[in-house]
Amino acid sequence: MKIMGKKARNAALVLAVVSAEQKKHALEMIALSLESQADEILCANNQDLINAAQNNMAAAMIDRLKLDELRLCAMIDSVRQIACLPDPVGQVINAWTRPNGLHISCVRTPLGVIGIIYESRPNVTIDASCLCLKSGNAAILRGGSDSFHSAYALHSALAMGLEKAGLPTDAIQMVETTDRDAVGEMLKGLDGTIDVIIPRGGQSLVKRVQSDARVPVFAHLAGLCHIYIDQSANVEMARDIVLNAKLRRTGICGAVETVLIDRQALEKFLPVLIALQEKGCEIRATEDIVSLVPTFALACEEDWSQEYLDAILSVKTVEGVEGAIEHIVRYSSGHTESIIAEDVGVVEIFFNRLDSAILLHNASTQFADGGEFGFGAEIGIATGKMHARGPIGVEQLTSFQYQIRGNGQVRP
């Protein structure tokens, strides 16, 4: 593992000075390699799916693990989108000239070596690697046992693309073991060679990384997303948004888990909940809602802090936007919250009073995604307040330095 860290550090030194065109070319070669290796990748993924079924993996987790031709094509498109993004390295964030003539520039620089620890999502192998490459960083990947065959096949395509582009294959390395001791070694920083750790997975993984890591961590613990439906909301819009936010993909961190409805307009928005139930979603609601629709289940206290990642939704009535804010502040994981409303004043209160990483107005929480932000892809959603926050794209994978140019100045 420590040798891997040293190789990554040496590769990072090369990537830091590679031109934007070289990186773009490497990403284009990776996309071509993924296309040429498609059959092998899907075959490897099928082996992971067979193992998952034998291990009685939950349906939502199998959905995360699954690759098909459509998802693989989307993955390849994402690589090409990343290739076409502006290169963040060397961008001048700000610049000014002091009265003494010193010209100061704040310039983006790579972070260095990024360790990515993840579980069952094969796309993380590609998204993380390509975002790191675009931002001039080396990557060390440690996938989970559930996606081992998929990740290995995808990494082979990555290495092929790097080699064709003339870049060091050590720029993207994969830990080829499922031994958990490897995670522990990465969390220690591999003798100072890892600069940042990014975990992608369940709460147990993220908690371990956050508690044991000796290097900075970009992470979110849970995607407990809320939607507040104000009395001023359009019913049809609310229906479309909530159905999408819950059921488009139930197993992703941007799926809504709790819907809060303005108590003054409960009957107006009952059709939204009934439509969800008709689509197979279990509704767990407060007593006033269940009294109107007895086929709904009665919610308990634990439901408000539950990330279901399934076709289950908690629903509660609240006293307007103030009640919604009070509930969200108490239970939110700081990931994503949405408000459906036509009253601009209510929207401003919602935006100004909540401090989650992503806030939306009249839009599905499933837009909490780097690709939807125009980032090409993302490594994850960071809910901390230091450095990276929200979708982690190429800019969030850079640091900065101050470059100062003078003409002989000395300090008096």
From Swiss-Prot:
UniProt keyword list: Amino-acid biosynthesis, Cytoplasm, NADP, Oxidoreductase, Proline biosynthesis
Enzyme Commission number, as recorded: 1.2.1.41
Any single Gene Ontology cellular-component annotation: cytoplasm
Predominant location category: cytoplasm
Single GO molecular function: NADP binding
Reactions mediated catalytically: L-glutamate 5-semialdehyde + phosphate + NADP(+) = L-glutamyl 5-phosphate + NADPH + H(+)
Entries under InterPro entries matching the protein: Ald_DH/histidinol_DH, Ald_DH_C, Ald_DH_N, Aldehyde_DH_dom, G-glutamylP_reductase_CS, Glu-5-SA_DH, GPR_dom
Pathway in which the depicted protein is active: Amino-acid biosynthesis; L-proline biosynthesis; L-glutamate 5-semialdehyde from L-glutamate: step 2/2
Keyword Transferase: no
Domain of life: Bacteria
Subcellular location field: Cytoplasm
Keyword Amino-acid biosynthesis: yes
Pfam (any one): Aldedh
GO biological process, one term: L-proline biosynthetic process
PANTHER family found in the cross-reference section: DELTA-1-PYRROLINE-5-CARBOXYLATE SYNTHASE, GLUTAMATE SEMIALDEHYDE DEHYDROGENASE
General function of this protein: Catalyzes the NADPH-dependent reduction of L-glutamate 5-phosphate into L-glutamate 5-semialdehyde and phosphate. The product spontaneously undergoes cyclization to form 1-pyrroline-5-carboxylate.
Family recorded in the similarity comment: Belongs to the gamma-glutamyl phosphate reductase family.
Protein name (Swiss-Prot/TrEMBL): Gamma-glutamyl phosphate reductase
Designated gene of the protein: proA
